[in-house]
Amino acid sequence: MKTICLIGGKLQGFEAAYLSKKADMKVVVIDKNPQALIRNYADEFHCFDVIKEPEKLLEISKNVDAILPVNENLECIKFLSSVKEEFSCPVLFDFEAYRISRDKKKSKEYFRSIGIPTPQDKPGRPPYFVKPPCESSSVGARIIYDEEELGELEPGMLVEEYVEGEVISLEVIGDGTHFAVVKETLIHIDRTYDCHMVTPLPSDLSFREISYSLAANLPLKGIMDVEAISGPQGLKVIEIDSRFPSQTPTAVYYSSGVNLIELLFRAFGEGVEEVKTLPEDRYCIYEHLMLAENGALIPVGEQVLSMGNDYGKYYEEPGIEIFLCRGEDPVFTLVFWGKDREEAENKKRTGLLILKDRFGAAV
């Protein structure tokens, strides 16, 4: 049995832990927060600050097969980059690609340098789409409809043209030479541009070629998530993230059969093969629903889940998995899958009835 060590105990960590368990791996989690969200979901939890106690991390590296950073703490990422050669196992992370992807201005310069379509910067007229330069895209992102609001923006905010359309996503895993473009997904977003649901999409050749080019020109050794707007103007890439994503990997797993953790291990081992075909006859619905005091189930994004204090599996049967995030209001992550959309929708109806029976949810 392989063992993976995850540095970070929040939602990225949960996604990686979940897929690691699907691959029959032992999961070790390190987080400096004693109340880390997934501390009870891990097989083994260590509470310490890797920057202050690096010797503990180096010792753990002797007993695991790989280390995967699953946090967005820049100080932590820089530290891991500085000591990666001292570990007794590989670090499944492309630090240079992360440096580019984390900085949205650098990312856009990279897009333009290789001819990738992306929203125009500082357009001459509203509406504008604004977002922070170095955060996950949903944090602080919003549409501005008039010029006056531009003057009230926080310093450093990026101002782009607002592009109408659906938010779509693709993961790419590279070994530095070969690049596996995996499965397209649709990102269902709420009013704060946070994702509350993920569903699979049919193959999109243009998006696949763009994603391959973005990975190959780095060249990527690790994982990268590509997000784009698909609308009347065609595809426009809005961001890349060279870190293990949350939410989409589970939908990818059930709709394609590809486990991104297993593929990431291969990228740092025997190498990856470029994906030629994927099964088209699978479907998955992945969503977050918060149970309000009145029993209503409200779609919520990751920002709400991240405020919880414990996250783990609640219910499972073929085609259905329900995870419970405990906090001020319980939040459920529901995963339904089947051979097609109809079967997945039927599983969803069954899952919602479970929440009705056990929690009094209004469905």
From Swiss-Prot:
Residues 85-269 form the ATP-grasp domain. Signal peptide: none annotated. SUPFAM superfamilies: Glutathione synthetase ATP-binding domain-like. GO terms for molecular function: ATP binding; ligase activity; metal ion binding. The keyword Ligase applies. The keyword Protein biosynthesis does not apply. Its cofactor is Mg(2+). Disruption phenotype: Cells lacking this gene are unable to translate UAG as pyrrolysine, and do not produce pyrrolysine. ADP binds at residues 104, 131, 138, 160-163, 239. Binds 2 magnesium ions per subunit. L-lysine binds at residues 11-12, 72, 246, 302. Its EC number is 6.3.2.59. It catalyses: (3R)-3-methyl-D-ornithine + L-lysine + ATP = (3R)-3-methyl-D-ornithyl-N(6)-L-lysine + ADP + phosphate + H(+). ATP binds at residues 10, 31, 49-50, 72-73. Gene3D superfamilies: ATP-grasp fold, B domain, NAD(P)-binding Rossmann-like Domain. It comes from the Archaea. Pathway: Amino-acid biosynthesis; L-pyrrolysine biosynthesis. Is required for the biosynthesis of pyrrolysine. Catalyzes the ATP-dependent ligation between (3R)-3-methyl-D-ornithine and L-lysine, leading to (3R)-3-methyl-D-ornithyl-N6-L-lysine. This is 3-methyl-D-ornithine--L-lysine ligase.
